[in-house]
Amino acid sequence: MRGNMNATLVDIPYRLSIRFATNGFSVYVYDVNDKIVATINLAYQHSGDTDSLREAVLSLKPSLPDCQSITLICETGFYTLVPKSFFVSEHALDFLKLQHPDVPETDQVFSHSFQNHDSVFIFAYDAGIIQTFIDIFPSLKIEHQLIPFVEQAERQDIISIFIREESMDCLLCHQGIIKLLNHYPYQTAEDIVYHVLNIAHHLQYDITEFEIAVYGDEANTKNHEEVIRTYLPQTDFRTIQ
């Protein structure tokens, strides 16, 4: 973990992004130009104990500058897209369970309506984790990791792949329209390539006409880069922040 940032970050309206995973979390501080000016990485193995989570988060707080906004980025495979014309907020969980009947009862459900897409993004995340962060950061905003990328996918033919340790999310947009958003398990880089080629085949797209972007932490993307580039040479690897 890097040192106290308050010594150099003063009197500027920063925003804070916290990306939480089961093996720890990363904190990014952005300036008014949306540039990362500081980063904190904290190893933490979450076992469901909110007291230890609270202690871990509180240990970070003295190192953080005052921020105009704080967002918790949730990484979870429990998500779905539904057309705006069908969406009813009171039935968000019901929509989610159509695709994910195993959503834990302890999870809290959130929804996000896109301005540039005719769909609503629904996701669920551990309510205990959410409440722990809100207790410490009362103005906290909750966001799924995929939402910014869906919002940015305008007028593009792009396949965005988000890789974690044993799972990947795939977003395919054609002419800025979402054609597919789904979650897949994988074990090897060859599995990732298979899923991408299989998706393009079933949707009857020429894979060479698509930009491909692979997102993940630096170590994870480097492990798969050589194999993926062999079969998908147009792939651009980007570190998630």
Please provide the spans of the model-predicted regions.
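Short glycine-rich, Thr/Ser-proximal phosphate-binding strand/loop in the N-terminal lobe
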Residues: 22-48, 175-189
